[in-house]
A protein has these predicted regions:
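Catalytic glycan-binding domains that act on GlcNAc-containing polysaccharides
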Residues: 1-105
Length: 105
């Protein structure tokens, strides 16, 4: 997760690129996806768009997405999923995957 943060924003919680915000460059669609997962799990908790500026809440959203779509904690899948979404393509996430792997070393 720290390598993804480094690649996404270099640790800047105020980073903004279009509708991607925070250390993990979270989009409004991802916040909505997290809230849908919480709803399916019958949790009363919900994330707000402003939570993207919080490092802790951004990490929570990352872990929630991974627990739902990557329950076996496959590192490669985690990286590609974060970059390309649920229906990621290997080819279109390859450069990002390599960048994160370099940041992990």
């Amino acid at each position: 997760m720290e390598a993804i943060i480094e690649v996404e924003s270099n640790g800047n919680k105020h980073a903004k690129n279009g509708n991607q915000i925070g250390v993990m460059q979270i989009t409004p669609i991802l916040v909505a996806d997290c809230n849908e997962i919480l709803k399916q799990r019958k949790s009363a908790k919900r994330f707000k768009l402003s939570d993207r500026f919080s490092v802790a809440k951004s990490k929570e959203m990352f872990l929630l997405i991974q627990s739902w779509y990557n329950p076996h904690n496959n590192v490669e899948k985690a990286i590609r999923l974060w970059n390309g979404g649920v229906n990621y393509k290997i080819k279109s996430t390859q450069r990002y995957y390599e960048k994160v792997m370099r940041a992990m070393k």
